[in-house]
């Protein structure tokens, strides 16, 4: 299983914001420069993260983006569920004639649940706290 770039960059954006001093604002432009991703793509990601409460977006001259809640309260599994379409196969009778008797979907769903269960054990704070190499890579030019 591979996460979509949408989820990948969503997690990266959250990691970047969590690496900043608590409450510090950043901008979508700054995040896109750090990761070298399209601004349009990042705008869509930040909008989704904001809609889900993971990011707070403030408009205006002194506006910007920052975490919508403490990094310790952001569960990695919740972020992945919010951003990632988690269907591994297209199991509708329209696309596959064995759908009525197939057990593969059950097995794959169990695998996804175990994957998410593991991600639920980790917070955004765990990914960034006391991580000097990460701070250096992300924040040296900020």
Curated annotation (Swiss-Prot):
GO cellular component: cytosol
GO molecular function: 2 iron, 2 sulfur cluster binding; DNA-binding transcription factor activity; double-stranded DNA binding; iron ion binding
Keyword Transmembrane annotated: no
Cofactor dependence: [2Fe-2S] cluster
Repressor in keyword set: yes
Positions contributing to [2Fe-2S] cluster binding: 91, 96, 102
Cofactor note: Binds 1 [2Fe-2S] cluster per subunit.
HTH rrf2-type domain residues: 2-129
Intrachain S-S bonds: none
Function noted in UniProt: Nitric oxide-sensitive repressor of genes involved in protecting the cell against nitrosative stress. May require iron for activity.
Protein name per the record: HTH-type transcriptional repressor NsrR
Transmembrane segments: none
DNA-binding region: 28-51
Keywords in alphabetical order: 2Fe-2S, DNA-binding, Iron, Iron-sulfur, Metal-binding, Repressor, Transcription, Transcription regulation
GO biological process: negative regulation of DNA-templated transcription
